[in-house]
Amino acid sequence: MSLFFLWLVSYYVGTLGTHTEIKRVAEEKVTLPCHHQLGLPEKDTLDIEWLLTDNEGNQKVVITYSSRHVYNNLTEEQKGRVAFASNFLAGDASLQIEPLKPSDEGRYTCKVKNSGRYVWSHVILKVLVRPSKPKCELEGEPTEGSDLTLQCESASGTKPIVYYWQRIREKEGEDEHLPPKSRIDYNNPGRVLLQNLTMASSGLYQCTAGNEAGKESCVVRVTVQYVQSIGMVAGAVTGIVAGALLIFLLIWLLIRRKSKDRYEEEDRPNEIREDAEAPRARLVKPSSSSSGSRSSRSGSSSTRSTGNSASRSQRTLSSEAAPQQPGLAPQAYSLIGPEVRGSEPKKVHHTTLTKAETTLSTTPSQSKAFQTV
């Protein structure tokens, strides 16, 4: 009775197997153990199967051995990365995964069956991810007497991630600890507040982010500035900008002045004064040789003179200015005015000729002058 009880207990333990938990870092290699003694009697009926239940409860087959064939490309996520680690026919059906990925995390089950006997084991695999390289930032103005916040954070990595700030020694005698007036935000360990900055607070600070898989770090430099020096720099920059604007304005005024002088010089010969005297007409006494020809053209000259009111008025003044002597015939004068270039001859209408004939008939002195000539 006692022997049967011991055999039953041993069979029960062999059937249920064991539960094992393994932690590995991503991109590394892992071997999940599974041992049995069911393949020795009959190898043809041996069946081995590895199953994965992920964190969401979904189950899938990883690798199997059946009918003397191995099937290890059953899932697209683990294709080419899973295999039996040793001689599974001799009793070592351990599973090897390389390289590890975060999606490989979950509960693995090894089932071995042969001739009605079976055994299985369970392995819980946790894939750890190293923290990504953190990003160090400064919040605030690094001026003397003010407060400055150092910010450090990793974008990815297995939780929890621990942050640690320290000062890097650049010179002999510098302290590696944070300044005395520094406070760590325990709700967010990646933030450190540096209060009441002094020139001694300047230096290089390093933040380290770490977890079970590893650690990464970043550095940032703090340069504390005097408030007076900032004012002087701002004043100097303002003065330089103002000076540059003034020089530009002077150059612009000079160019504008030269352009204006050049324009005045070009337009000066074409100016017309309003108080300038009009060109004077002069009277020319015709010679005896040309009197006949002028007499023949008297009609047309009279016609043209009547067409121009200004010429007619000047001729009348000339006639009055030259008094006639008794017994002598009046002399004919021709009005010579300033030469007009580029002027076209005016057209004389029929009505103008009619008016001219009427004027000639009503002017006795002018008619007598033409008759005498």
UniProtKB/Swiss-Prot annotation:
Transmembrane stretches in the record are 235-255
On induction, the UniProt comment says: Up-regulated in mature adipocytes and adipocyte tissue of obese animals.
Record's compositionally biased regions (Polar residues): 364-373
Top-level taxon: Eukaryota
Q: What InterPro entries does this protein map onto?
A: CLMP (IPR042454), Ig-like_dom (IPR007110), Ig-like_dom_sf (IPR036179), Ig-like_fold (IPR013783), Ig_sub (IPR003599), Ig_sub2 (IPR003598), Ig_V-set (IPR013106)
Compositional bias (Basic and acidic residues) spans? 263-280
**Entry keywords, A to Z:** Cell junction, Cell membrane, Disulfide bond, Glycoprotein, Immunoglobulin domain, Membrane, Repeat, Signal, Tight junction, Transmembrane, Transmembrane helix
Record topological domains on the Cytoplasmic side: 256-373
Expression sites (tissue/organ): Predominantly expressed in epithelial cells within different tissues and in the white adipose tissue. Expressed at high levels in the heart and brain, at intermediate levels in the lung, skeletal muscle, kidney and testis and at low levels in the liver and spleen.
Q: Does the keyword Oxidoreductase apply?
A: no
Q: Which GO terms describe its cellular component?
A: bicellular tight junction; cytoplasmic microtubule; postsynaptic membrane
Q: Where is the Ig-like C2-type domain?
A: 18-126, 134-223
Q: Which cysteines are joined by disulfide bonds?
A: 34-110, 152-207
In what way does this protein cross or attach to the membrane? Single-pass type I membrane protein
Topological domain spans for side Extracellular: 18-234
Region Disordered, as annotated, extends over 263-373
SUPFAM superfamilies linked to this entry: Immunoglobulin (SSF48726)
Q: Per the record's keyword annotation, is Transmembrane helix included, yes or no? A: yes
Which cell locations does it reside in? Answer: Cell junction, Tight junction; Cell membrane
Function in brief: May be involved in the cell-cell adhesion. May play a role in adipocyte differentiation and development of obesity. Is required for normal small intestine development.
Any idea what this protein is called? CXADR-like membrane protein
Provide the taxonomic classification: Eukaryota, Metazoa, Chordata, Craniata, Vertebrata
